[in-house]
Amino acid sequence: MTQFASPVLHSLLDTDAYKLHMQQAVFHHYYDVQVAAEFRCRGDDLLGIYADAIREQVDAMQHLRLQEDEFQWLSGLPFFKPDYLNWLREFRYNPAQVCVTNDNGKLNIRLTGPWREVIMWEVPLLAVISELVHHYRSPNAGVDQALDALESKLVDFTALTANLDMSRFHLMDFGTRRRFSREVQQAIVKRLQQESWFVGTSNYDLARRLALTPMGTQAHEWFQAHQQISPDLATSQRAALAAWLNEYPDQLGIALTDCITMDAFLRDFGIEFASRYQGLRHDSGDPVAWGEKAIAHYEKLGIDPLTKTLVFSDNLDLQKAVELYRHFASRVQLSFGIGTRLTCDIPQVKPLNIVIKLVECNGKPVAKLSDSPGKTICHDKAFVRALRKAFDLPQVRKAS
């Protein structure tokens, strides 16, 4: 299936903020590290028929480059260094790093190359896949239907929060990867800008064009890669946390907790890290149980939870966000990142549950052992066993 009308992507910045944040850290600290990443569809969708169309879009991405106005805008942000931005100015996507195949209806994608380059593929490639699939499956759906659905949800949201103090409710758009389309995401974000509790977007292109705050720190791959970068597997998570502070000592201080489960994370998150990091991000498992563990951990360390921020971003919608806000608002600072339930929430449209995750670093396996068993990713069962042993986790979950 080919012949999509035009390139889906129009800007190098049409990606999530944490990709550039991580890329700068990789550029400075791990310039020569090599990685491999793979696509997964967690649902039962047979997406292989779109392989040719996806390959066309991958080829088109080599023409994207950082424009001068984009360069100047990034230069005005407090956390980017001139050497990285000058390098990014010359960056081009290399389609040779991407292998796209149709395996009897199953879509297979494997990315290989220097981490500093491969790191850029995940978010825009997922956005491309999502937009292509929805273009063919739902050709008559689009911005109008998405905005109608959002308005209906906002009416319910207003009723739900009528008697709540919403002054500490902060919502972010995290919807780039699985959006219905670029146009839908932009329309949704522009509508949400009218709400006092909407504080920003993870999409750098939208943040620049709509004068919003870009949101994001690091992703699972930062911790996964350190499983092979660090000489000692048992201390790899601490090495990742320390390396992040080395690059960003006073900003971008929200740590992701579920690469090797929340319990293993908290064992590594001692007083020095807990004091210096601004807060934590939830991305799998029971959010209430996770939040209670986080608050208890801060209290045990003698840190006032009200000086820290918990970011919830796992499969949220507005109603779930309000429920979590009711539960935690008086005890800790809160932010909520909603993705698919904002940017691909259209009647009769089935969002894709798709990811691209790191599977190798320097030719050796890495793994994600999240707080949701179905999100565990690794080819090498022996490495999963070694990782569980190193972090004192029970040998129960299977890698997928």
UniProtKB/Swiss-Prot annotation:
Pathway: Cofactor biosynthesis; NAD(+) biosynthesis; nicotinate D-ribonucleotide from nicotinate: step 1/1. Transiently phosphorylated on a His residue during the reaction cycle. Phosphorylation strongly increases the affinity for substrates and increases the rate of nicotinate D-ribonucleotide production. Dephosphorylation regenerates the low-affinity form of the enzyme, leading to product release. GO terms for biological process: NAD biosynthetic process via the salvage pathway. Keywords: Ligase, Phosphoprotein, Pyridine nucleotide biosynthesis. GO terms for cellular component: cytosol. Its EC number is 6.3.4.21. InterPro entries: N/Namide_PRibTrfase, NAPRTase_N, Nic_PRibTrfase, Nic_PRibTrfase-Fam, Nicotinate_pribotase-like_C. The keyword Ligase applies. The modification Phosphohistidine is found at H220. It catalyses: nicotinate + 5-phospho-alpha-D-ribose 1-diphosphate + ATP + H2O = nicotinate beta-D-ribonucleotide + ADP + phosphate + diphosphate. It comes from the Bacteria. It holds the Pfam family NAPRTase. Belongs to the NAPRTase family. HAMAP family: NAPRTase (MF_00570). Catalyzes the synthesis of beta-nicotinate D-ribonucleotide from nicotinate and 5-phospho-D-ribose 1-phosphate at the expense of ATP. PANTHER family: NICOTINATE PHOSPHORIBOSYLTRANSFERASE. NCBIfam families: NAPRTase, PRK05321.1. This is Nicotinate phosphoribosyltransferase. It comes from Salmonella paratyphi B (strain ATCC BAA-1250 / SPB7).
